[in-house]
Amino acid sequence: MKRRDILKGLTIFPLSAGIFGKTFLNPALTGPSLNTKSKRDLFKELGIRTFINARGTITFMTGSLMHDYVLETISDTSKEFCMLDELQDKVGEKIAQMSHAESAMVTSGAFSALTLGMAGILTGTDRKYAEQLPNLEGSGMKSEVIIQKSHKIDYNHALLNCGVKLVFVETPGDVDAAVNERTASMHFLGSGAVEGTIMPEDWLRLAKKHNLPASIDIAANIPPVSNIWHFNDMGFHFVALSGGKAIRGPQSAGILMGTKEIIAGARLNAPPRGFNVGRGMKVNKEEILGMYVALERYLQQDHDVEWKMWESRVKTIASAAESVKGVSTRSYVPPIADHTPTINIEWDTEKIKISGDQMLKKLSAGSPSIEAYGGGKNSITVSPWMMLPGQEKIVAERIKQELSKASA
C-alpha cells in the first residue's frame, strides 16, 4: 500500500480489507520477513547480542517484533508531511470505532496513555489548569486517586506524574470512606484483577455511586482480542493499552481510549502543545499510522489459528524436554496478563544436576542465544508467544541438549 493510499483512507474510507484482510497469510504464521533485514548488520557491527525470545513481550527485551505491514507503513508515510493534530483526529476516530470508544488517540506507550488520561480528567480542556500540572496545591483541581492496595505497582508513577496522591483501599467500604471532595478518579489495574478484592464490575459500580470517572490499565491484557473493546463496553472512562506486545505495532506507541471529554483533555496535555505535562511524550506521524494499521490488522487476524499455533509450539518443546528421563512438563495459560499457552519444565535434581538458574544462563550464553525465564531450584518457564516460525524447534533441541548433558 502506498503512503498516499493510507492517508487517503483516513479521510474517505477504512484501509481496504482486500489489502489488509484475510486474503493475506496470517502474520502469526509467517512472522516478519527475513528479507526486511538491511545489508548492514548493525547488531553485529556494534557487538549487540540478539536472541530467540522464549519469554514474552518484555520491554527491556525490546517487546515484540513489528509485522512487515507496520514497517512498510512507517517507511511509506515517512515521505510526506501532514498536520499532527489532523492526523490524531482522523486516526483517533478510526481507533475509537474499532474499540467501541467515544474517542481515542495514539500515545507514546501505555505509560504515556495513563499520564495523559489522568491529566485529561484533572484539567479537562482548560489551558490554565494544564499549565499548572503537576502542581495541584491551590490550583482548584482535584488531587486524589483511589486504587486497590493489591494494584500497587511501579507503573502507577504514570498517574503520579500529574501530581496526584494515590489512596489505597481493600474493600468497598474502604472506597466509600476514602471518597472526599479531593477525589479525582478511581483507577484499576487490569492485570491485577485476580489479586484484587474488588472486581472490575464492582469497581465501576462504586465509581458510578460516587459520580467518579474510572480508569483501567490493560497494557498487558491482550490477548484476548475482545479486551480491546470489552472495557470500553463496560463503561470505563479511559482505557490505556500498549501498542507493542500482542498487537505488534511500534513498541514505543500506545493507545488511549475513553470519553470524548477525557480524550479532549488528554490531547490538550499532549504534543504538539508545549505548555503541558505531556510535551516530552512525542509520537511521530509514522508511529501513529503504524499503530493504526497494526490495530486494524490485528482485529482481522484469525486468532483461533494463532492460538493453535502456540499450542503446537508448546507440544514440540514439551516432547523434546520429556524425552530426557527425570523431566516433567506442565502446560498452562496465565489467567490475565500474557494470556497465551506457556510451558513450565521441571526436573528431578537427583537425576539431572543443574539448577533452573544455571539452565537459563546456559541457554542465554549459547548460540543462538535463548532467553527463557523462571529459574530457581529445578525448573524454567518458556513462552513460545514471540518466537518466529521454526524457532520452537531450536528451543526444544537446546533444552533437550542441556538437560541431557546434566543427566547423572
Residue ranges and their predicted role:
Residues 1-2:
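N-terminal secretory signal peptides
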Residues 42, 320-398:
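Conserved C-terminal alpha-helix-loop-beta "cap" of PLP-dependent enzymes
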